[in-house]
């Protein structure tokens, strides 16, 4: 299978290199178009005020296009202009840190997959529930083996399959669960600090209270040690409220 690979952690990130190696070893052809720099939490941002520049990375058996832009830039430019062949599947990841519940609104990883889906490609987002530097080569091999089992023929157009791996050894994973997103939200705050020169700055912090996470949702099952699989469709229309607002029509 020909696969286009991207991420938001950057083209040199361990997660991308791990899944690249695993996909190649599984017999796939992999074309990489990923950001040159760290782009976590940029969401679906697109570069419009400056040109996009591309750097080719070719080292130790790895080859890919590095884009000085966002994950969405990578997909728009890569799928329309850089890649010689259309992929059969787009994979975004493996991200350092889970993308569950409200995380998908901020995630460059999920946004890259979403952009690919909107362009008519089958797309998967892969994430690992830890920010610590860890060897996730076994998880990458597991993911490479899991992807061919997705039954795309039965899925609607522009669907993104969002897959998250728990931060446990592969042999300790309890299984795979297809589940909805949690509706729990982040409780954010900013820490006010002072730099060595006396200047003020603010640092974002936050937590999702565990008691607000409903059982059977992606965050709950991921914490329990399951791989979570959640299909995403980016239609933000609140269909239930449409009729309630009908009185505004003239």
Swiss-Prot record:
It comes from the Bacteria. Its cofactor is a divalent metal cation. NCBIfam families: PRK00346.1-4 (NF001490), surE (TIGR00087). Keywords: Cytoplasm, Hydrolase, Metal-binding, Nucleotide-binding. GO terms for cellular component: cytoplasm. This is 5'-nucleotidase SurE. One of its GO terms (molecular function) is 5'-nucleotidase activity. Its main location: cytoplasm. InterPro entries: SurE, SurE-like_Pase/nucleotidase, SurE-like_sf. Its EC number is 3.1.3.5. Belongs to the SurE nucleotidase family. The keyword Cytoplasm applies. It comes from Nitratidesulfovibrio vulgaris (strain DP4). The lineage of its organism: Bacteria, Pseudomonadati, Thermodesulfobacteriota, Desulfovibrionia, Desulfovibrionales. HAMAP family: SurE. It is found in: Cytoplasm. It catalyses: a ribonucleoside 5'-phosphate + H2O = a ribonucleoside + phosphate.
